Regions:
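Short, well-ordered strand-loop elements centered on a beta-strand within folded domains, enriched
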Residues: 18-23, 43, 95-102
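Compact, well-ordered interaction domains used in eukaryotic information-processing assemblies
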Residues: 32-80
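Intrinsically disordered, low-complexity acidic/polar segments
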Residues: 52-54, 76, 92, 106-110
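"Short basic amphipathic alpha-helical interaction patches in structured regions
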Residues: 57-61, 79-86, 100, 114
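Mixed-charge, glycine-accented linear interaction segment located at domain edges/termini
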Residues: 103-136
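Short peripheral tails and domain-boundary helices/loops at the edges of structured domains
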Residues: 84-107
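N-terminal "first-domain core" detector
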Residues: 1-38
């Protein structure tokens, strides 16, 4: 296994036909490449307890959630993962959110879904390209 510092976390969701990125204010965090046969990564985020309801709603949906993380340095390009919330733990005034998932190629999977949603909303041409780039 390889362990790295988690320096940035964004949750990417579709809300009211729009793709929304929510920046999560990290207190601390780790990201672990489990190097298993399934190419699984563990993302552990320590955040303020005021995020509890936000993460509970996501967890209760029992759906996969796309996230972007910055690994080791805030200046690094974000890596995109498809994850699910494994657990949420109370730690004093904070919560520890454990996500399990797989790193994805930005040209595939959920990104294609995001592009399809934009096309369905009527975006086309340069406006589509601009909107799509703003989401990446």
């Amino acid at each position: 296994m390889k362990t790295f510092l988690l320096k940035g976390l964004q949750i990417i969701e579709s809300q009211n036909e729009e793709i929304v990125k929510t920046d999560i204010n990290l207190l601390d965090g780790l990201i672990i490449n489990r190097e298993d046969d399934n190419n699984t990564w563990l993302i552990e985020a320590l955040v303020d307890k005021n995020y509890l309801d936000f993460f509970k709603v996501i967890q209760e949906k029992e759906e996969q959630v796309m996230i972007e993380v910055k690994i080791s340095k805030t200046t690094n390009a974000p890596a995109t993962f498809i994850t699910s919330i494994d657990s949420i733990n109370n730690i004093g005034k904070h919560i520890n959110v454990m996500l399990m998932g797989k790193i994805i190629d930005k040209r595939k999977s959920k990104i294609e879904e995001m592009l399809s949603e934009l096309i369905e909303k009527g975006y086309e041409g340069e406006i589509l390209l601009t909107k799509f780039k703003s989401l990446l």
